[in-house]
Each structure stands twice: as C-alpha cells, then as structure tokens.
Amino acid sequence: MNEILIITTYYPPETGAAANRIAQLANGLEKNGFKVTVITPLPNYPTGRIFKNYKGSFHKTSHEDHITIHRLWIYASNSKNKLLRLLAMLSYSFSLLWFFIWKKVPNKVIVQSPPLLVAFTCMFFLNRKKRKLILNVSDLWPLAGLHLGVFKKNFAYRILEFIEHFNYRKADLILGQSEEILAHISSLCPNNKTFLYRNYPDFEMPRLEESYQDNDKIKLVYAGLLGVAQGVFKLCQKLDYSTIEFHVYGAGHEKESIINYISNNPSLPIIYHGEVSRGYLHPELIKYDLAIIPLRNRIYGSVPSKLFEYSRLGLPVLYFGGGEGEKIVEKYSLGWIAKVGNYSNLNIVLSRINKADFTLKNKVSIQQVALNQFDFNRQLKKFIKQL
C-alpha cells in the first residue's frame, strides 16, 4: 500500500477551515488506497489551550477512520505577542524533530505551510533523494503578514523571506490554493512543479426548498474565525442596518469585542450565536438569505474556502475581500461584490439587494456551479496522478 505522511498544525477535533481542509485531504487519500499518517500538535485551536482530553500528554497516538494520527506536544498559545507565537512554533518544531529521529518517515510527505518555521523544519530535516516532499501552501507568508500590517520590511522580514524561498526550493511539488499563490511561487522558483489545489469541500449537498418569510429584512450571516484579518468587529460597527439583520457564528480574537458591542448597542439587529460544529452550522446557514465573506485588507493569494463551501449549500455571497475571490464570484455568478475596505460601497451594494433576489432557482443554480466546477473528488484524482 502507498504510504503518505501529512504534517499539519491544525486537525480535528479543532474547528475551522484549516483543520477541515487537511482532514478532508487525509480521508480522501485513504479512500483512494493510501495508508495515511497525520502529525499534528495536541489540539489547542482556537482557544490557545490544550483540549481537556489531551492535557498532560507529550505524544498521543490514535486511529480514526483508518488514519493514524500522532498528536505531539506544543507550547499552546493564541496570544498576539509575537515572541509567544514564535515559542509555540519552535516547541512544535522540536517535537517534530524528536518524532523524525525515533519514527520511520514514509517516502511521500505533504507539509502544510504556513507556519513557515514548521514547514522549514520539515523541508530541512526530511530532504532525501528518495523522498518526495509536497508543500501545501494555503497563504503567502510573510507577504500576507505584510499586507495585514503584522510585519514591516526589516531584517526579521528578510529572514522569513529566506525561509519561504528555501521551503519552495526543497519541494518536489508545490500545491497552491489560488492562481496568485502559484504565480508568486513561479516568479521565485520558475523550475518548480506546481499544482492548483483549491479548498473544495466534500459534504452531501443539501436539498433546497422554497422559503417564505414575513420579515422584509435581509438575513445576513457571517460564520468563521473572528480574527483581525476578517474584521468582523469593524463590520458590526460600519454596517447600515436599515435593510438587514446580522447573524454571527464563530470564535477568535475579536469575539469579546463583538459581544461587548452588541451588549452596548441593544437596538441593533446583531445576533451572536457562538461557536458551533460544522455539522450543526450547515443546516442553519441555508436558513439565511446571504453570507458575507470579508477580509479587512486585500491579501494577495487569498481565496477564502467559504466561497466554495457556501456555493455547495446554494447560499449566495456578498464578497468583501478583493483579489482572486472577486473574479470567482463574478465568473460563476455566486452573488455580489463590494470593494474591499470600502464600507460606504458595501452599504450601497446591500441597499440594492432585496428579498426577491433570493429565489430557489438562483440557489439551485449556485449549487449546480459547485457540482460542475468545484468538485473535490475530481480535483483529488488529478492530484494523486502527480504523486
């Protein structure tokens, strides 16, 4: 049997797009005849604390859905402090080194990047002539950090760029979740083999029914990470609520700020539903009219996986993130676009949308696009041929 190792920083029972994406890849490879092993830290995201059932462990191994999962020790932290975040990544990197020394590593390895330091550890220490290293790039780091204002172009930034370029050079195959990511990598390493691997979901498509609502207001929903990059707190402050009510699901750095804002502004139609499981969320999402996908700043290379997830649910989107995601929404008629960072334009776009736009026919049409254009299994089979 073909053996393959996946090294990641996020994996269930952690929640979020990153954990779901890697779990889906692992399950897909297993179903296609691979013996899959996953290495991941002890679960701690998004709280920054090791989950209750894993506390006190240094290394915990389990077998789930025919996949072997090694969960390694990490200094868990979700602090904004850069030194604490660095310490977390260093601790996981040392745990990986310990694993590489004492355990046999297969000849096919998929490494998730970012985090850059974890990817560097893998690309440096696992580099062998007979081993195929596949680098799965979901964000262009440190460039994305520069766009978000996390980094300045200084000595530390140049070190991160060096690590980024090193990782690309050592990869036998690079997966990128967007055309922009692949273009950036090809500009740095033109001889590298690349493959466009979108974050397509793989769940049963729900059957949609006509909904009748007395409320004239549009039910707008956001579901996901409540982080700095998404800017949902600012969204709560800037939205014009004349024609909408705003529902929020998720957790992250901005959670408390959002809860406090709702508490201090009880007249605004903002409802925070907390963090829920993906299985619970999907049936809830199809009850809404429109989902918003925001990015506080345009991040080169970023295409939020929600875009593909919502299309499978038949849920129209209001895309507020710029870049390649805009082009996908336009090309496949998945919803509406507002200029990234321009809240006046966002409110103008919202004011021009009415309840009559959310017909069953339109929602089914969006699902059909997902079926024909965003198919996980079709993409996976093409990827397997590259292995």
Kindly label every feature range from the protein language model.
Residues 180, 197-200:
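Carbohydrate-associated surface elements
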Residues 230, 277-284, 291-311, 317-328:
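Nucleotide-sugar-dependent
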Residues 213-230, 236-247:
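Conserved donor-binding/catalytic core segment of Leloir-type glycosyltransferases
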Residues 1-65, 202, 237-240:
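N-terminal subdomain of nucleotide-sugar transferases
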Residues 132, 143-166, 203, 228:
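Nucleotide-sugar donor phosphate/pyrophosphate-binding loop at the beta->alpha transition
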Residues 94-97, 117-120, 124-128, 154-174:
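Membrane-proximal helix-turn-helix segments that form the acceptor-binding/catalytic region
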Residues 217, 245-250, 256-282:
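Nucleotide-activated donor-binding/catalytic signature segment of Leloir-type glycosyltransferases, i.e.
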Residues 341-347, 357-387:
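A charged, aromatic-enriched C-terminal amphipathic alpha-helix characteristic of glycosyltransferases
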